[in-house]
Amino acid sequence: PDRRWLHEVRDRASVGDLVRAPWPHLLIRRLDPPRPSLRVGWTGTPASTPQLVAGVRARARGGADDAAYSAFLRDSESCLDALVRALEEDDPRQVRQQIGRSRHLLTRLGATSGIAIETPRLRRLVEVAQEHGAAAKGSGAGGGDCGIALCLPGTDVPGMCSAWEAAGIRPLDLSVYSRPEDAP
């Protein structure tokens, strides 16, 4: 969301009005839970998304990095749109491709900004997940913390979780919420 806009309007509108108002640069839409199961691994290193994003933005302002940051935002939006389509169409090949593309965009942003978005342990989380058949990337802004793995058909989930644990990565017992009326 556009935090500057939110800061400007939050004192002039009630919470209810604010929640119902259209927000610039924000779209919230319900997606059915993906057919591939979602697994989350924690690296044991907490990270702050607001701090990482602020650091990247601060380095990007006004310099050559500003164009790279704008390109990152544009390319990420395109990637997200393609991922949503792939999930809606239940296209595992495209899901894998877009998760990989998102990871590449974040890694490139980290290199451009000089901020470690993908730590060695987070990189290992992704590598292990891919070795076991999942599509994976860091979650949030990166910096350590958690990674997600979309376990596509054929993923060896128990093997992946065991390998994560052997690498010091804790599999978290989380799941995507599903409304009772959507249950099979």
Regions found by a protein language model. Give the residues of each.
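C-terminal nucleotide
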Residues: 1-137, 148-184
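Short Gly/Ser/Thr- and Asp/Glu-enriched loop/turn motifs at secondary-structure junctions
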Residues: 140-145
